[in-house]
C-alpha cells in the first residue's frame, strides 16, 4: 500500500512540475533576450558559428568507445572469480563487438576527417 501511495504521489508531482515547466516559459519571450549581446552594440554579423557535423560524429564515437573501454577496466578483478572461463568468454565477446564496431566505422569512413 505504501508503494502505491508513493508511486501515485510521485506521478502526480511529476505531472504537475512538467505542466508548469511547459507553460511557464511561454509567458515572457523578449526578442532582446534572444539576440546576441556584443557590449551594447548592434551585432556586426551572426553570432552563430558554423559547426562541423563530422567533428560531432567523431566526438560521439570517441565517447562511446571510451565508455566501453572503461567497462573493461575492472576485468583483472573479475579474474579472481571462481569461474574464469565465463569471464574470459564474456570479455572476449565484448572486445569482439568493440572491434566489429570500430571496423564498421572505419569502412563507412566515419572516422575520416576529410571527404
From Swiss-Prot:
Enzyme class, first EC level, given as a word: translocase
Catalytic activities: a ubiquinone + NADH + 5 H(+)(in) = a ubiquinol + NAD(+) + 4 H(+)(out)
Recorded superkingdom: Eukaryota
Membrane topology: Multi-pass membrane protein
InterPro entries: NADH_UbQ/plastoQ_OxRdtase_su3 (IPR000440), NDAH_ubi_oxred_su3_sf (IPR038430)
Keywords: Electron transport, Membrane, Mitochondrion, Mitochondrion inner membrane, NAD, Respiratory chain, Translocase, Transmembrane, Transmembrane helix, Transport, Ubiquinone
Family statement: Belongs to the complex I subunit 3 family.
Protein name: NADH-ubiquinone oxidoreductase chain 3
